[in-house]
């Protein structure tokens, strides 16, 4: 049963066309393979189901009466059938994104045939409550619209905080639902929300499954309600600062490579990944430790900035120490626009540039902590 659910929702877009007498629309992978799935994890299975089973659409409107696929007046059997976005939860949860025929032998499934099934336009498909959203603007009309936001392989979920909190546009339905439950006093004011993420990366033309993604993030639920706007700005600012710090670390790796005469440009990406690895667990602990009722945003931000500065500075020192003698002596690199000019790159110079950028990003910090 779990395999069948997975096939229906995550199947790739490899050719499954059967009809040869008529053109059929392109439909892509199964629905869950096209979105960045998130859900809320409870303390047990029942609580998990209740925390994700939305009895209201996000925004508070009632769903239309439930019509699962087996209760449709006219059962759909056509290949690659485009349908309207579901207006009721049961239809969405039971939609046949693939037509699967199971081959049975002595009460066992020994094979199957699969064709493309139902699909709908993902633009503004807010009936789907378990996805992040990307805010976009039509270049011709200027109208704003939203598309599901897929998870980026290797990118920690806390770096998507703006999309979880709706700072980036539309709040995911399950997040809205849990803040609604808390607002109705069905969840504690001290509730720690555990957000889980699942995603799939496909290969060229989505013809095969290439990689999968899982992550989880815990935080105080009050951070995500309407009264938590100040905290959302605070956390989002620190996420953005981490992005800038990662670029500063990557630039140090580039400059050290040039100082050593190495033209290989892969070191910067590896250095950025190393920085994110260093700050990953500390950031998660900092985020989970925020209590909106007793903490002050300025103080908590300063607490994190001290950690971030210290971790980045330590990583920078290690990179310089490991750069080697050639990097300390230095290397001249010709100017790309004017070959007659050249610039001297050395490890000490690269380190000074790194420290300047880091201190500019975190001006109240030094290697010993808060000034």
Enumerate the predicted regions with their spans.
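Extended alpha-helical scaffolding segments
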Residues: 1, 6-371
């Amino acid at each position: 049963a779990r395999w069948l659910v997975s096939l229906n929702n995550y199947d790739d877009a490899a050719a499954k066309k059967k009809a040869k007498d008529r053109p059929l629309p392109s439909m892509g992978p199964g629905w869950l393979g096209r979105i960045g799935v998130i859900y809320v994890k409870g303390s047990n299975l029942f609580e998990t189901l209740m925390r994700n089973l939305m009895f209201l659409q996000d925004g508070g409107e009632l769903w239309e009466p439930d019509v699962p696929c087996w209760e449709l007046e006219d059962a759909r059997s056509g290949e690659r059938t485009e349908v309207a976005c579901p207006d009721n939860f049961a239809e969405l949860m039971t939609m046949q994104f693939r037509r699967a025929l199971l081959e049975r032998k002595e009460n066992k499934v020994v094979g199957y045939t699969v064709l493309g099934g139902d699909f709908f336009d993902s633009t503004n498909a807010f009936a789907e409550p378990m996805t992040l959203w990307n805010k976009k603007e039509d270049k011709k009309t200027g109208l704003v619209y939203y598309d599901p936001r897929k998870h980026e392989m290797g990118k920690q979920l806390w770096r998507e905080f703006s999309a979880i909190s709706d700072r980036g546009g539309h709040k995911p339905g399950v997040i809205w639902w849990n803040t609604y439950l808390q607002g109705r006093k069905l969840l504690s004011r001290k509730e720690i929300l555990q957000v889980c993420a699942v995603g799939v990366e496909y290969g060229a033309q989505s013809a095969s499954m290439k990689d999968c993604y899982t992550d989880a993030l815990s935080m105080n639920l009050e951070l995500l309600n309407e009264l938590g706007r100040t905290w959302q700005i605070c956390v989002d600012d620190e996420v953005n600062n981490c992005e800038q710090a990662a670029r500063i670390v990557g630039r140090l790796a580039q400059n050290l490579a040039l100082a050593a005469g190495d033209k290989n440009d892969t070191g910067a990406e590896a250095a950025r990944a190393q920085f994110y690895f260093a700050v990953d667990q500390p950031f998660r602990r900092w985020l989970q430790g925020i209590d909106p009722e007793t903490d002050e945003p300025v103080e908590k931000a300063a607490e994190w900035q001290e950690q971030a500065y210290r971790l980045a500075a330590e990583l920078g020192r290690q990179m310089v120490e490991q750069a080697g003698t050639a990097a300390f002596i230095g290397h001249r690199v010709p100017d790309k626009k004017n070959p007659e000019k050249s610039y001297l790159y050395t490890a000490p110079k690269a380190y000074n540039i790194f420290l300047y950028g880091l201190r500019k990003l975190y001006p109240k910090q030094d290697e010993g902590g808060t000034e």
